[in-house]
Amino acid sequence: MKTILTLLFAFSVSTLFSQQNSFKPGAIWPDNNGVHINAHGGGILHYNGIYYWFGEHKTEGRKGNNTLVGVHCYSSKDLYNWKDEGIALKISDDTTSLIQKGCVIERPKVIYNKKNNQFVMWFHHELKGKGYDAAMTGVAVSKNVAGPYKWLKSVNPNAGIWPVNFTAELKAMKFTEKLKDWSEEWKTAVKQGLFVQRDFTKGQMARDMALYVDDNGKAYHIHASEENLTLHISELNDDYTDFTGKYITVAPAGHNEAPSLFKKDGKYFMITSGCTGWAPNAARLMSADSIMGEWSFIGNPCLGDKADITYNSQSTYILPVPGKNGMFIFMADRWVPENAIDGRYIWLPIQFDPKGTPFLEWKDEWSY
């Protein structure tokens, strides 16, 4: 019996640390130490032939939905097997710091700035004990891809600046009447800039966010704004550490969050979700010929069973796979708010119909 138990233990350890060669959406995903990867709401940076996955480090229970550790980093050469690189951005024990323990840091994304040979991280930032009222975005930098990252600041973007797609008529609008939330009159007012005007002086709200670097090196910050009712796409400066003041509103009063953006054959696509808290809902697909142009709604990109809840997940990032022309991976989170650390990852290949429209189908297991 002792021999059998020894063999079983050896087999289980061997299995735990065995090399992965496929994606298994929703399954436990062990790192090189056999521990479930802890990088929620994350994104990928491909640098010098290595993939770096940055995400929220969650802890046990509901309290784990607040940030108690920081932003975790993992590295991989093949996207299947990941090495724990530790905490890239640590939160502070200083109770006077905006990024103190117990604040909220969500959806961290990292891009590389060639001009300064510097890695730049942006994230959604909420202040400790303030719920989701602050709606700020934070930025941190490092000379080393895996960190440590130094937090620079957190802001409400584009203070004192109108969106470039606002007409003179919209800028001149006056909202004096108290409107009932979700009434048709209220929705019309939102489309006309009700919340843009409200937040004009202090800066706009920035919650769920993504980053995108275009072919010409221009970087953009995409975020849910205006009480999660409207998306904003903001241009970043040449250092990627601040806003230029050029931004547009997208899908006003559309109630989108969890943006993820990619480009194929000169056309931009964005996948978002609706706003139902931690609960999943149907994904939304939009497209545009210019990132700062007019975005058109296409519909739900998901097909098959549970398409109406995005296979029980929410988008976080879309990865263009280097060396695989036209290959994109849809990355999403399956949240477990009652035990945050147990959140799972849903990675699926983006497919394209004959007209070039992206779509998703569930796969229990797949490889590229």
Which ranges hold each PLM region?
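Bacterial Sec-dependent N-terminal signal peptides
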Residues: 1-20
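Carbohydrate-active catalytic/glycan-binding domains of CAZyme proteins
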Residues: 18-368
